[in-house]
Structure formats: C-alpha cells, structure tokens
C-alpha cells in the first residue's frame, strides 16, 4: 500500500515561541472529531530511515490518525532519530529537546522517540530526556500504535533487537514526491568496518525476498513513480543470506521484469562486490542507470587496513578502471573519511593523489567521528580535529574543479530532466537528470516561460555549469533530435 505525501508533512515546522498559536488548521472540525488524533514526525538521517518514517506514517493513517506539519497541532510528536556519528546524534538530541519543550507547553501531547539513537542508548536516552513517553529502537514499528493505544499503563522503554525490513504490504506514505521513491531491499550489515556502529544498531544483513521487492516496485510504478532508488547498508550483498541464495544481479533482473520504471538507481555499492556480471547487466539495460555510488572511504592501503576494509589502493584503482571500461558513460560517486586514527600526511597525500588520478564525478568527504562502541574508538594516534577539518577542506577544494570539469561535458547536450520543485530565489524550475542522485548531488536549473508539472520528464538543453549544478533551457518535445528519448 503506497500513498503520496507532501514532504512538508514529514518534517515538523518548529517554532519554540512560548506564545505561539497553532497555524490555521488544515482539517475541518468534523475530520478532527472523527480522527484518533493528530501526528507530526521529524525524520532524521539516511534514506533508509526515511523509508522507516514513511512506513510509520502509513500505519498512523491506516489506523485513523491525521498528519500535521505544525507541532502545535500534533497530539503525538514523533522523532525518528539518527545516531550514526556525533553530528547526527547532536541533531537528534536537539530535535528531541525541541519537541520536549513543546510538550512542556502543552502537557497533553505525547513524545515518541524511535530510530538509531534510541537503539544505541536505550534507557540512557530516557535519563537524558525524561519527557519521552515512548521509546522504540530501529524497528518493530508495528508495535508503536498498539503501545500508544493500550488501556493498561505501559513502560516507556521498548527498545529490542532490530527486526527485518518491512514488507511491501506495510502501508507507506511516500514523502519524496510522486516521481521518486526509495526501495529498502534489506536491513542491517555484515561488514566490520572499524569506524562504523551500524551493525550494532541495525543487526546483521537481512534481505527482503525477491517476490516482496518485486511486488513493491510494481505498486510504486503503477502509481506513477519514475525513479526507483534501491538502498540498504550494503546493496551488493543482497540475497546472499536468503535460504534460496540470490544476488543483486538477479534482483535487478526481477525488477526489470516487474515494472516499467525508466530510472532504476542503486546506492551503497560495496566496492569488492561490484563484479563483472553486475557491470555487464548495467551496460546492457538502459533502465539501470549507470550511476555507481561506491563508498571507498580511503585510498591508502594502510588506512584501509586499519578501517578493516577489504580493498587496497591497487584494487580501488582497478575498480575505477573496470567500471569505466565496462560502462563507458558511468557516473562515479564516492565518499571518503579523513582524519582516521593514525592517518599520516603521507597517507593523506595518497588519497589526494587518488582523487586527482581517478577524476570521480561526485565526492563526499567526512571527518572521522570517534564513536564509542566501534573498534576504531580504541585505536591510538588520534588525529587532531582541526587537522582533520583542514584535510577535508583541502580534499574538497581539489575535487570541486574536477566535478566542474566532469559536468562541462553536458554543456551543449539535451538531457531528460525530472521536474521536482520551483526555486523562488532563481525564478526557475529545478530537477535532476539521470547522473544526479537526490539530495547528495547537484541539480538542473530549468529556464522556461511556462508552468511545469511536477514529476514529469522534460527536455532541457544544457547551457552552462553553475558550481555543482547545471543550467539549461526548456525545449519542446518536438525539438528533440531524432532517436532522442526523454527517459
């Protein structure tokens, strides 16, 4: 069951003014009287958490609750947290505090906290935030509404071991617009990266079945979704844990047979599992976007060894060559960590050299976050935070002109752009073409003199590069060159 929801309904619009009045109600008195209550949700963290939030919202709607964007209108304040690194934890705790402040102003409201932060800290989170009425971890969201509606008094802490990824028959309110949706193909992770706490929070890798995913993508595309974005902690590991062993390649073939979505994108591909069979399939099938999101984390062999990653400098070099040889129009995106314990100037220079050599299309850079509970937390030779930040800035300064140069090849080309929003500041419509993933990459700014419908493909002639974005003119479909298709 898939429904659509405007993004504004997912993230609460917070105003901490003690004298603030609720915004103009979006529901009639009759609707409010017939509803079980009103719910507002703050969803933090990654795309996998977004899917969890969408399923929570779907369950609330199915059970007769109304969704609101203004927390002053909400009877239930839900914060779905992220606890991956220090910055994410800080944002989650600030959001909890903001909702707790509103609860103090309006004591009848209930504050529910879910997600990775509650999975990580459990009862300790209740000590830090005593205003919480109900605490759930990273999963078992099917128990949320029964716990809230139970007649007998309930304990607050209901954090348990995480469960499997929810199936397609769980109601879900899509928050990413009518044209694009994340498809979570698995839960958990089997890798042992020393910097990462996710396996402790989300458990081991558990794949959804081929049938279940096929049913979901068919439903999504039947309802007008043009872009399916496959996500998990390690998308290339898919199917290896199933009783009847499968693979990402088999899943992709099943998805192609199950739906007509023109864009099928994969995120979080573990480098050592990007094999020839997968590359050949992507090269062969036009609907499988040749967009490779492969988090490499570093390029120096010794740093990778301390991170407990399988690859080494020569293997990551070879991977880039293999992808481009097999899929000539491939877009390569990766993320890197700088300031990992023991990272020397020479090891950092190896990373800089790799960035210059590999000419990746998109790069994200993070400073190492020293997380208690990870193996890296106990490593010696911690890098000073100021040094790590300087290295991050240096790496991004190196990558920016590379990205701009890679984008230049699109100038003069006509591309199909998926229209997603209108930018008031620049007075233009905004969308993405196939080489841009949502939220993490640049966008296409569309110059036109007409109103465009959201969620459709339009032909755009790219005229210039603006930082990480592209700028272009809207064309009529009749202006497309022969054999040019929109998707």
Curated annotation (Swiss-Prot):
EC number: 2.8.4.4
A molecular function GO annotation: aspartic acid methylthiotransferase activity
Cellular compartment(s): Cytoplasm
Superkingdom, taxonomy of origin: Bacteria
Domain annotation TRAM: ranges: 408-476
Cysteines engaged in disulfide bonds, as pairs: none
Protein family per UniProt: Belongs to the methylthiotransferase family. RimO subfamily.
Protein purpose: Catalyzes the methylthiolation of an aspartic acid residue of ribosomal protein uS12.
Name listed for the protein in its UniProt record: Ribosomal protein uS12 methylthiotransferase RimO
Native organism: Magnetococcus marinus (strain ATCC BAA-1437 / JCM 17883 / MC-1)
Gene (UniProt): rimO
């Amino acid at each position: 069951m898939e429904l659509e929801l405007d993004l504004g309904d997912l993230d609460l619009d917070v105003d901490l003014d003690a004298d603030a009045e609720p915004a103009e109600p979006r529901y009639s008195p009759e609707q409010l009287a017939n509803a079980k209550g009103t719910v507002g949700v703050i969803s933090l963290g990654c795309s996998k958490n977004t899917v969890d939030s969408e399923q929570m919202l779907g369950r609330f709607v199915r059970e007769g609750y109304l969704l609101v964007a203004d927390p002053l209108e909400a009877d239930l304040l839900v914060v779905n947290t992220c606890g991956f690194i220090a910055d994410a934890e800080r944002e989650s705790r600030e959001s909890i505090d903001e909702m707790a402040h509103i609860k103090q102003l309006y004591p009848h409201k209930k504050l529910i906290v879910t997600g990775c932060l509650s999975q990580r800290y459990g009862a300790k989170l209740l000590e830090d935030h005593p205003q919480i009425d109900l605490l759930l971890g990273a999963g078992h969201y099917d128990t949320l509404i029964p716990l809230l509606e139970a007649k007998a008094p309930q304990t607050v802490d209901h954090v348990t071991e995480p469960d499997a990824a929810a199936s397609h028959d769980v109601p879900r309110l899509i928050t990413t617009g009518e044209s694009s949706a994340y498809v979570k193909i698995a839960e958990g992770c089997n890798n042992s990266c020393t910097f990462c706490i996710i396996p402790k929070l989300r458990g081991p890798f558990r794949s959804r079945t081929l049938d279940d995913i096929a049913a979901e993508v068919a439903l999504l595309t039947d309802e007008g979704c043009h872009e399916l974005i496959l996500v998990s902690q390690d998308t290339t590991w898919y199917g290896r844990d199933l009783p009847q062993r499968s693979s990402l390649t088999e899943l992709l073939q099943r998805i192609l047979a199950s739906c007509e979505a023109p864009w099928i994108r994969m995120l979080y591909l573990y480098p050592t599992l990007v094999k020839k069979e997968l590359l050949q399939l992507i090269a062969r099938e036009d609907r499988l976007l040749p967009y490779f999101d492969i988090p490499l984390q570093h390029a120096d062999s010794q740093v990778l060894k301390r991170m407990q990653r399988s690859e080494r400098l020569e293997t990551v070099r070879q991977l880039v060559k293999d992808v481009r040889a097999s899929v000539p129009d491939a877009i390569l995106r990766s993320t890197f960590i700088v300031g990992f314990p023991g990272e020397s100037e020479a090891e950092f220079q190896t990373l800089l050299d790799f960035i210059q050599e590999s000419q990746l299309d998109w790069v994200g850079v993070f400073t190492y976050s020293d997380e208690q509970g990870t193996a890296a937390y106990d490593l010696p030779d911690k890098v000073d935070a100021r040094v790590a930040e300087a290295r991050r800035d240096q790496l991004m300064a190196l990558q920016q002109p590379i990205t701009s140069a890679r984008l230049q090849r699109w100038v003069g080309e006509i591309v199909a752009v998926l229209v997603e929003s209108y930018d008031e500041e620049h007075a233009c419509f905004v969308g993405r073409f196939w080489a841009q993933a949502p939220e993490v990459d640049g966008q296409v700014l569309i110059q036109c003199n007409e109103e465009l419908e959201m969620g459709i493909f339009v032909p755009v002639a790219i005229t210039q590069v603006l930082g990480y974005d592209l700028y272009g003119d809207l064309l009529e479909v009749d202006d497309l060159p022969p054999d040019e298709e929109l998707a």
